[in-house]
């Protein structure tokens, strides 16, 4: 993962050879392993490229990269499939080499159509004076734009900053395709034309879908001198997933027979489903595809060579490379169980569980606390060593997600007692929440600005920071997760009707309405969730990875009719995400399989910490910068 930025100026007086310090600071936090800036000047414009790398695979490749023709590339992504990247290679260099070899626009689009994995990029073509940029189909990596000074400058960046009273604020680049700007033309005309190469479905007959609403994701707040147009050659990117199967059953009996034996939410209900040969086969296919997704996201990671014996590695000195945002719910439990298959047994897995407490406690509630102030267990000095959370001991925050998290831990320990499962209790006081929201989180959540964005953004920021308590049979100690990769279950609810609004739509409009709701959820996930979560997690120099949004996982689920994935005639805790619950049963997780959906803002209790009478869609004043 990286922090990438390109600042473009069309006038000398508005050009700076350095990024503003607050923006540079935010970018460096995303990429702690290397930083570099590169200036490219032409007759009519200047470009300042800034790259900050979190090194995770292959040889450390310092960004931005430049070739002998003056082309420049910034890459914030992971190639998990589609383009060949050898184990010892770095995907930044592989992608740049492939781009440099492209002879025309069609070849560039073909390259990005092949990539499976999250990405955002900025690519400068020196010979044509074209600047290309964009995000993957789901928008799993953040990219923002800011246009200012009446057409005299603009900036692209992984993360922005908030400044009180400044009108030209950042917006998310829509994940509707790849954009191209002719810099020479923009400089002469004093207007910026964003040429869009949209995503399209390609049929089996190699026919592209008709261009209908390619511009609907374009933000409404662009200044007058900026316009978005579809490229005149009608070129496009091939969507990386198959269309959603909206087939309806020929008769109600086709689905009623599946649950006629029971309408209760019990383990036996799920076991009955698995007695059906067709259902069991689909569930096993789902597990196999999701398993490959998790494997790719775990093995695409450089691990430190450790020559110590296995006996030594089993001690607390072993470092976790993978962490999971963990509530004990079915999403995180299935991810943890599959991750356990591929992570070396002598390597711990960090389970990050966050809770918010209403007021600061004084003192430590448990005597004989063993504080480890060395190696990766050290409480770091930056923003945290004297923070209220350091005084919030374990056992002080038995919120719903803590209760289900501990139950999930026991279930995982029974599945694999040989694994070291680090259940990290992350307790956040109101004082620390307010302090770090002002200092850090508000800059990351923006340009999203609702109460829901505030709650989720803050919860994910503290969880992914990984500073808390590690409670074992022998001791309780302060702990900081060393994992650079964080797996999260986002995407499961959107695809598998996990939200209450899915059930409401089903009750009012049946399966047809449910299909439309699922399509809408997946279509807006880039603008609603993923850019924000990437900025929030990346702020700790860590990378978010989303197994449920692997292209093959989404294609498999999209190919199934809705009644083979969910059954909302059954009660909460069974009917929604049914195929995932059945997978949990197959993986030996029967208790977790029956837990109903609980959103992180409620499970962690952050929603009740401040104003409890707000609506999720309200604009959140706590995210605004004050004078």
Swiss-Prot record:
Residues 2-184 form the Glutamine amidotransferase type-2 domain. SUPFAM superfamilies: Adenine nucleotide alpha hydrolases-like, N-terminal nucleophile aminohydrolases (Ntn hydrolases). GO terms for biological process: adipose tissue development; asparagine biosynthetic process; muscle organ development; skeletal muscle organ development; skeletal muscle tissue development; transdifferentiation. The active site is at 2 (for gatase activity). Residues 308-597 form the Asparagine synthetase domain. One of its GO terms (molecular function) is asparagine synthase (glutamine-hydrolyzing) activity. Residues 373-404 are annotated as: Disordered. Gene3D superfamilies: Glutamine Phosphoribosylpyrophosphate, subunit 1, domain 1, HUPs. The keyword Amino-acid biosynthesis applies. Pfam families: Asn_synthase, GATase_7. Keywords: Amino-acid biosynthesis, Asparagine biosynthesis, Glutamine amidotransferase. This is Asparagine synthetase domain-containing protein 1. It comes from Mus musculus (Mouse).
